[in-house]
C-alpha cells in the first residue's frame, strides 16, 4: 500500500514505475473536492468490500456513488496533469525563498528532513524553532491569521504522537518544537514574507517566556539542532 495522499499533485506518480499493489490519493491536494479519495488497485489484487451490499464501485463500497465528487476529482486530475511541471517549479522557488527568509530572520531554526531538492516535496517545510513549544506557536500564529499546524499532526486522543519521530531517528522534542508550513502555486513571495514576519514575532515572544530557551542561551542545555544537517540550520 503506497500512501500518496500528500505527494499527489506535487510529484510525478507513475504506477508502471512504482508498481504499487494499492495507492491512495487525495484530490483536494490539487484543488479537487474535499471528502473524496482515490484508490488505485493493481489488477489481480483482491480486496474485501468496505461496505457490503450493492455492486457500486466495483463491489467494494455499496451505496449510491457521490457523482459530483467523482466528476470533480476526475476533472482535478485532468487539469493537474497539464500543469504539474510548472506547479512544481513555482512551488520549489517559494520553498527556497521561505527557507532563506527563516534562516535570515529567526535564529536557532532548522528543517526536519532533506534540504529542498529532488528528495523533498516542493510545497512544504517542517521547521524546528528551538526553545519553543510547537502547539503554543501554532495557536499564536493562527490567531494572527497564519494557517499552519504543529510538526506532528497525527495524534490520538491521549496526545500521543505518531511514529514519524521514531522512523526518522530524531528525538520527539524536535518535532514538538516545529511547525509544518505548506503552500500552493498561487501563493506569492509576499505571502510567504508576511508569514515569516508573523512567525518571527511569535517565536520571539515565546522565547522570552521559555525556560528551555534561557537554558540553551546560558549553555546549561545542549542544542538539539546538532542532530539536523548543517545545510538546513540557522545559527
Predicted regions and their residues:
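Pyridoxal 5′-phosphate
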Residues: 1-235
Amino acid at each position: 500500500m503506497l500512501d500518496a495522499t500528500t505527494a499527489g499533485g506535487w510529484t510525478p506518480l507513475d504506477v508502471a514505475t512504482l508498481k504499487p499493489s494499492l495507492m491512495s490519493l487525495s484530490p483536494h491536494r490539487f484543488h479537487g473536492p474535499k471528502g473524496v479519495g482515490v484508490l488505485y488497485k493493481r489488477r489481480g489484487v483482491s480486496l474485501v468490500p468496505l461496505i457490503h451490499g450493492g455492486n457500486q464501485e466495483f463491489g467494494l463500497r455499496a451505496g449510491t456513488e457521490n457523482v459530483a465528487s467523482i466528476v470533480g476529482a476526475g476533472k482535478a486530475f485532468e487539469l493537474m496533469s497539464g500543469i504539474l511541471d510548472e506547479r512544481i517549479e513555482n512551488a520549489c522557488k517559494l520553498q527556497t525563498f521561505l527557507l532563506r527568509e527563516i534562516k535570515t530572520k529567526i535564529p536557532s531554526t532548522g528543517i526536519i528532513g532533506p534540504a529542498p531538492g529532488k528528495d523533498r516535496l516542493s510545497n512544504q517545510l517542517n521547521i524546528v524553532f528551538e526553545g519553543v513549544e510547537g502547539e503554543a506557536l501554532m495557536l499564536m500564529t493562527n490567531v494572527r491569521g497564519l494557517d499552519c499546524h504543529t510538526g506532528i499532526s497525527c495524534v490520538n486522543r491521549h496526545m500521543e504522537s505518531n511514529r514519524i519521530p521514531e522512523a526518522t531517528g530524531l528525538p520527539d522534542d524536535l518535532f514538538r518544537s516545529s511547525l509544518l508550513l505548506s503552500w500552493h502555486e498561487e501563493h506569492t513571495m509576499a505571502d510567504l514574507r508576511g508569514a515569516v514576519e508573523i512567525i518571527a514575532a511569535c517565536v520571539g515572544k515565546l522565547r522570552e517566556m521559555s525556560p528551555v530557551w534561557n537554558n540553551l542561551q546560558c549553555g546549561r542545555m545542549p542544542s538539539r539542532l546538532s542532530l539536523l544537517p548543517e545545510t538546513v540550520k540557522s545559527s
